[in-house]
């Protein structure tokens, strides 16, 4: 027997966690705000659905439509503009420790390295290439994560890279890592999106890998 405890239709509400209160008992707990309040709402509100799924085989949990059906229908009138694609990118070398996000002697997102990845993508029918660590601010990692989303590092020539990718028929995937510093990102967001558009980049990956400021949680109502 396989089981899953989860939730659906989680909108403007804290995520549920499970706390073991006995050998066979669990208690649902909500991730609080820094002041201990679980959820800030008016007099009338709707909680998320809480689900329990049980199946004789693990694949039954994956194949279940329960959570899908408890969520609201898609609000988009048309979805034909959504295009899935396969991509590679400069990021795994950082996790392996052979490259860095910040600009130094092992910097991963350089113009020369970008062209190598674009060549590989073009040769293997891979539509896109993602570059992490292309913009100023990675040296602040571990602090406030003050990224600048329109200033490439000096060794990352955005215009040359975009032009090279276009010649090869490869899409550039932009990257905005907030590091959890959401206020810093929101101040720059409109300008950063326009900047990408002006440079011919129309696909974006965002990241929220760092801790939120002021004790806020990724799993609380704020996140």
Segments predicted by a language model, with ranges:
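Generic structural hydrophobic/aromatic packing signal, biased to beta-strands
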Residues: 1-3, 49-53, 88-90, 129, ...
């Amino acid at each position: 027997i396989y089981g899953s405890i989860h939730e659906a239709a989680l909108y403007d509400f804290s995520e549920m966690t499970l706390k073991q209160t006995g050998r066979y008992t669990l208690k649902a707990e909500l991730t609080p705000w820094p002041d201990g309040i679980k959820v800030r709402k008016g007099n009338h509100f709707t909680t998320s659905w809480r689900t329990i799924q049980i199946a004789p085989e693990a694949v039954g949990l994956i194949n279940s439509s329960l959570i899908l059906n408890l969520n609201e229908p898609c609000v988009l009138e048309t979805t034909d503009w959504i295009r899935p694609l396969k991509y590679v990118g400069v990021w795994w070398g950082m996790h392996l420790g052979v490259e860095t996000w910040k600009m130094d002697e092992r910097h991963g997102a350089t113009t020369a390295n970008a062209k190598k990845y674009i060549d590989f993508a073009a040769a293997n029918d891979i539509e896109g290439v993602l570059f992490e660590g292309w913009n100023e601010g990675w040296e602040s990692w571990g602090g406030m994560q003050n990224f600048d989303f329109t200033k490439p590092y000096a060794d990352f020539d955005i215009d040359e890279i975009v032009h090279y990718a276009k010649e090869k028929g490869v899409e550039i995937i932009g990257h905005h890592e907030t590091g959890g510093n959401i206020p810093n990102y929101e101040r720059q967001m409109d300008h950063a999106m326009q900047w990408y558009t002006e440079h011919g980049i129309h696909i974006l990956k965002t990241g929220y890998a760092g801790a939120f400021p002021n004790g806020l949680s990724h799993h609380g109502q704020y996140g």
